[in-house]
């Protein structure tokens, strides 16, 4: 048995197998998973496995190969063999190998087997040239001359030089700018706010904000300018657009220490004003869609660093503005020396340049985060005429109070057309314009709560546009101790009611000059061109309207047609306040309701004019008794009610708010004694009018009640605005 003699030295002993099984850990299966057999040994002894499988020894064939490999001293077990050859030449090479994940660290176990690592080695990486395959196919010399793809700087420089030689000259406007190599297209190093943050990395050989697919780079001739998903053969559309440069507004920058402050310096000067500039973003925006293909640079250029055929600009050196009319502000003229804090705040390490001015209205201006005031306000003085009929009163030259809104005690005198605005404390969000959209007279709630409600403080939407108001103002001025009106009153002369005691007399329509020297031309209605009206009103643009056109516009929302114009002014019956006839107007009913609670039998016309229609003044001026005075739509007096009214108010139970229909009372509402004629009213009046109780409850003095739409203040406001004649 020569075969058995060959097998016997290498064959395992049954007693040896029993000892091996007794000593091995039955749970440790890692030793039996990976074979250590080499393909060379396996091919040298092809009959070992077959004969050994036929022997009745009961051992496992894998163990026989393991023992056979250990007895052979020609090659070590840790000899590095390619795992592909090991699997293909082995007996079970067709079975995919599955490595079980156990608690044993297999990286150390497979260290001697040369198992491929997770990362691909550098020599096995594909060599990809930075050009398209279509260009490589059409130009064989280009593919042969191109070096291998690398990120080294010298190779990229050679590649760009080679591409610049092969690129054809372009003449289209979209290819107008070709960057030079190593061109600082941003000028970041010259920005004062970024010097201390470290130098900008200038090792880019192409613009970091420019995509290779755009038209302004050396790769412009290698790529199609039309996207694949587009059916338009045009270069006007491209998606996605090139990404913008990273933001420097929100980037935290360390504040200056030891050198000149970038904020307000101790002595305001032009040098300190230009130390910190607001970045001027690009102003010219082209109308076509090719603007999305342009590189988005932040700074405009004014220092002569432009290159021929280049749209890339450097940082500005002059004090340019971001708006259409750049105007410089000298801080020593506009801002006072003691108005604001002049030192930089040292409480924070970084300052952010993108802070909004609307978020810190209460703090000082110098405490905002390092941004100077936008230099778009001219030095406002008396000689500046901003528009034809709009004037700023710059009586405080060289002070901050010439700007619109730094002090609550300044006086702004705005002339719009032929009327004067009333004085009032000013804010940034109030430009002195009318508070209401229709621009008519003030409402009851706005006048009463002018100094009580902080939300309405400073909103005086009244115009002194009628001779009655002007005469009342002149009379109150003559009766006051201050004498002639001045342009800048003391803080004690702020308006306490609907009108101010320091308002200049307005231009008067009609022939009522009353000794005034600034009487202008007679106003005419901008809609129907009439000059005879009992009350002048205004449209939302501030143009004068007659009473009919103004009411029609306010009630219906459309312009009054000229077909409704009549030459005769119809006057309503004002003979008695307690008349309960069918043709009684709503105004007399309103006054009758007011007088019924006061238990007064009748009221004269002059007393009703005193209590409802004549605007009161501060110093107790009386109403003019001239027969030709034109009444205005004004507010009720701000003074308290009489003693009888105060006593009646304490005992009156306030009825809930109700709506009355003039031809029929609503079911479920008990009519009062003074509301009895509403069932006998003419049926033409069918509009539902919300009414308030005759005497307002004590809670009506709360400013919150007047700001609620549909409440008692709103109903009184509606009645006073529309039915004040």
From Swiss-Prot:
Where found, per UniProt?
Nucleus
Where are the compositionally biased (Low complexity) regions?
631-656, 678-704
Question: Compositionally biased, Basic and acidic residues: which spans?
Answer: 39-48
Sorted keywords for this record are: Activator, DNA-binding, Metal-binding, Nitrate assimilation, Nucleus, Transcription, Transcription regulation, Zinc, Zinc-finger
The residue ranges flagged as biased composition, category Polar residues, are 442-452, 479-500, 575-584, 597-624
Q: Which InterPro entries match?
A: Transcription_factor_GATA, Znf_GATA, Znf_NHR/GATA
Q: Name one GO cellular component term.
A: nucleus
Per UniProt, the GATA-type Zn-finger stretches lie at 525-549
| SMART domains according to UniProt | ZnF_GATA (SM00401)
What biological function has been recorded for the protein in this entry?
Major nitrogen regulatory protein.
State the protein's name.
Answer: Nitrogen regulatory protein areA
Q: Which organism is it from?
A: Penicillium chrysogenum
Gene symbol here is AREA
């Amino acid at each position: 048995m020569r075969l058995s003699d060959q097998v016997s030295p290498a064959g395992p002993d049954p007693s040896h197998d029993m000892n091996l099984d007794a000593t091995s850990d039955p749970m440790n299966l890692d030793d039996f998973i990976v074979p250590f057999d080499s393909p060379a040994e396996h091919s040298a002894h092809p009959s070992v496995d077959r004969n050994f499988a036929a022997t009745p020894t009961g051992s496992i064939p894998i163990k026989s190969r393991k023992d056979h490999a250990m007895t052979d001293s020609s090659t070590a077990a840790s000899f590095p063999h390619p795992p592909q050859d090991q699997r293909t030449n082995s007996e079970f090479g067709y079975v995919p190998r599955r490595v079980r994940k156990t608690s044993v660290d297999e990286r150390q176990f497979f260290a001697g087997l040369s198992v491929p690592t997770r990362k691909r080695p550098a020599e096995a990486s594909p060599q990809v040239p930075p050009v398209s395959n279509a260009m490589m196919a059409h130009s064989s010399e280009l593919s042969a001359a191109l070096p291998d793809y690398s990120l080294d700087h010298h190779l990229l420089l050679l590649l760009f030089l080679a591409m610049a030689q092969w690129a054809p000259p372009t003449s289209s406007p979209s290819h107008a700018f070709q960057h030079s190599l190593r061109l600082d297209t941003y000028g970041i190093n010259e920005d004062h706010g970024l010097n201390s943050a470290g130098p900008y990395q200038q090792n880019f050989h192409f613009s970091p904000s420019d995509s290779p697919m755009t038209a302004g780079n050396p790769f412009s001739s290698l790529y199609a300018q039309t996207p694949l998903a587009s059916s338009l053969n045009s270069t006007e559309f491209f998606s996605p657009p090139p990404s913008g440069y990273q933001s420097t507004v929100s980037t935290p920058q360390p504040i200056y220490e030891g050198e000149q402050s970038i904020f307000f310096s101790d002595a305001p000067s032009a040098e300190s004003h230009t130390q910190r500039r607001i970045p001027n973003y690009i102003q010219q925006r082209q109308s076509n869609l090719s603007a999305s293909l342009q590189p988005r640079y932040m700074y405009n250029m004014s220092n002569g660093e432009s290159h021929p055929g280049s749209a890339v600009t450097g940082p500005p050196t002059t004090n340019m503005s971001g708006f259409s009319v750049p105007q410089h502000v000298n801080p020593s003229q506009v801002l006072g020396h003691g108005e604001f804090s002049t030192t930089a705040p040292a409480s924070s390490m970084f300052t952010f340049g993108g802070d909004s001015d609307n978020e810190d209205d209460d703090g000082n201006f110098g405490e905002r985060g390092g941004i100077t005031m936008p230099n778009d306000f001219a030095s406002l003085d008396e000689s500046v005429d901003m528009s034809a009929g709009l004037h700023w009163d710059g009586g405080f030259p060289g002070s901050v109070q010439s700007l619109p809104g730094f002090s609550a005690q300044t006086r702004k005198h705005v002339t719009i057309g032929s009327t004067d605005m009333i004085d009032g404390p000013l804010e940034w969000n109030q430009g002195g314009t009318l508070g209401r959209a229709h621009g008519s007279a003030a409402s009851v709630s706005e006048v009463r709560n002018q100094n009580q409600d902080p939300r309405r403080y400073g909103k005086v939407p009244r115009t002194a546009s009628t001779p009655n108001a002007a005469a009342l103002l002149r009379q109150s001025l003559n009766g006051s101790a201050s004498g002639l009106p001045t342009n800048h009153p003391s803080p004690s002369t702020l308006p306490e009611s609907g009108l101010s005691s320091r308002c200049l007399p307005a231009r008067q329509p009609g022939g009522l000059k009353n000794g005034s020297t600034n009487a202008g031309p007679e106003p005419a209605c901008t809609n129907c061109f009439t000059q005879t009206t009992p009350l002048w009103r205004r449209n939302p643009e501030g143009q004068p309207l007659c009473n009919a056109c103004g009411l029609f516009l306010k009630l219906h929302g459309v312009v009054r047609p000229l077909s409704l114009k009549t030459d005769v002014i119809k006057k309503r019956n004002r003979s008695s306040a307690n008349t309960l006839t069918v043709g009684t107007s709503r105004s007399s009913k309103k006054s009758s309701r007011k007088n019924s609670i006061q238990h007064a039998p009748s009221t004269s016309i002059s007393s009703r004019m005193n209590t409802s229609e004549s605007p009161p003044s501060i110093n107790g001026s009386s109403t003019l008794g001239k027969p030709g005075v034109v009444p205005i739509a004004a507010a009720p007096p701000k003074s308290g009610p009489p003693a009888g009214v105060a006593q009646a108010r304490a005992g009156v139970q306030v009825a809930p708010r109700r709506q009355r229909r003039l031809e029929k009372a609503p079911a479920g509402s008990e009519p009062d004694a003074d509301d009895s004629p509403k069932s006998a009213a003419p049926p033409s009046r069918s509009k539902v009018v919300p009414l308030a109780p005759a005497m307002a409850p004590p809670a009506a003095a709360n400013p919150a009640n007047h700001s609620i739409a549909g409440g008692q203040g709103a109903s009184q406001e509606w009645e006073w605005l529309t039915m004040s004649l």
